[in-house]
Each structure stands twice: as structure tokens, then as C-alpha cells.
Regions:
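Hydrophobic alpha-helical segments, especially transmembrane helices
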Residues: 15, 26, 62, 149-150
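Catalytic helix-loop patch of NAD(P)-dependent Rossmann-fold dehydrogenases
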Residues: 1-34, 39-41, 45-50
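Conserved sequence/active-site signature of Rossmann-fold short-chain dehydrogenase/reductase
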Residues: 40-42, 54-55, 92
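C-terminal substrate-binding subdomain of Rossmann-fold SDR/epimerase-dehydratase oxidoreductases
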Residues: 58, 64-186
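Conserved active-site helix of classical SDR/Rossmann-fold NAD(P)-dependent CH-OH oxidoreductases
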Residues: 15-22, 56-60, 93-94
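Catalytic Tyr-X3-Lys helix of short-chain dehydrogenase/reductase
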Residues: 21-26, 62-63, 187
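Short acidic-hydrophobic sequence patches enriched in Asp/Glu that either
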Residues: 50, 54, 118
Length: 189
């Protein structure tokens, strides 16, 4: 399909990486494997809500607002309708191991859960995990981005790999890590 205009440079870089692996394989006989992971999250992520991806940004925003007054409202971009797929980094590590052991092909492999959630559902889960009790609202003057991003993961599943960490479990463990490393120094706008 067509590339999302807000993300086309990143998509082109991914395509270039796939082509490079294929060229190394053909020219040098190097068994390069190109993996295309979905949205990743987990320990050591970037939690700066101004520059991070949506999941760690939401953890940062809601956690950073726990001590605010009852009148504080967290503002979230868009309307919450876009759908995204998320994969915990530990599941990606297992997928890499599986592919190194069991894959000899030259086509790229999508790595994900094959399941998506709306950004609204993601926010509701994070609100519950963090224990945020104040209001939040959607700022529809901000962009939604691509309506839906979910990968076809049939190829990696045919190798016997399946993700083990549910989205909620992953958010819970990521939030525990986040609190343990004291990311409370991040400030809200």
C-alpha cells in the first residue's frame, strides 16, 4: 500500500534494510534475516512523553499526573480511534532466537502479535494499571496518524513462535520497571 506521509522516511529506511539483507545474502552468501517488528515497548524504553512512542508516553503522562489536583486533565492526541499492535521486547528477543535457529528464507519476517487495540483501549488499560483517577481528554486538533497498523504474522507463527506476554502483563511489568528507575523527573507540559 501507500506509505503514510508522516512516516514515509522511516518506512523507506525499513525497506532499504530489507533490500540490504537480500543483497548481502545474494552477493556474499551471508545468511542475513530481516525482521520487521511491530510497535515495541518494555524496560529501557524512551518515556519522554514529548518524543516517545504512544505506549511509554501514556505511562509517563498518567504516572506524572498521579499527584496533580483533581482538576488536572491529561490531554491525549487525536480521538483514540486508531488501532495499533504492540509487542513486548522480551517477546521480540525470543522471536529473534527462533528465526536465527529455524529460518533460512530471504524474505523479511513480520514479528508481532497479529492483534490490535485502539489507542483509547490502550489508554484505559494504562489508566487502570497506573491507578490514575482524574480525567483525561482527547485533543482532536492533534493528528491520529495511520488508522490501523497490524502485521500479518503467519510466517513467524509457522516457525512455532508465539508471543508469551499479554499486553496487560507487559504494561504492568513495564510500569513496575519505570517506577523502580524513578522516571519521575520527567515534567509535564
Amino acid at each position: 500500500g501507500h506509505l503514510e506521509s508522516s512516516n514515509d522516511a522511516y518506512a523507506i529506511a525499513k525497506i532499504a534494510g530489507i533490500k540490504m539483507c537480500q543483497a548481502y545474502r545474494k552477493q556474499y552468501g551471508f545468511n542475513a534475516i530481516s525482521l520487521m517488528p511491530t510497535n515495541l515497548y518494555g524496560p529501557n524504553d524512551n518515556f519522554d512523553h514529548n518524543s516517545s512512542h504512544v505506549l511509554p508516553a501514556l505511562i509517563s503522562k498518567f504516572h506524572g499526573s498521579l499527584e496533580k489536583s483533581k482538576h488536572w486533565v491529561v490531554k491525549l492526541w487525536g480521538d483514540g480511534s486508531p488501532k495499533r499492535e504492540f509487542l513486548h521486547v522480551d517477546d521480540l528477543a525470543e522471536a529473534c532466537h527462533t528465526c536465527m535457529q529455524d529460518y533460512e528464507g530471504d524474505e523479511h519476517i513480520n514479528v508481532g502479535t497479529g492483534e490490535d487495540v485502539t489507542i483509547k483501549e490502550l489508554a484505559e488499560t494504562i489508566v487502570d494499571v497506573v491507578g490514575y483517577e482524574n480525567d483525561y481528554e482527547w485533543d482532536t486538533t492533534k493528528p491520529n496518524g495511520t488508522p490501523r497498523k497490524v502485521l500479518n504474522v503467519d510466517k513467524i507463527k509457522s516457525l512455532g513462535w508465539e508471543p508469551k506476554i499479554s499486553l496487560r502483563e507487559g504494561i504492568e511489568s513495564t510500569y513496575e520497571w519505570y517506577k523502580a528507575v524513578s522516571y519521575t523527573h520527567l515534567t509535564l507540559p
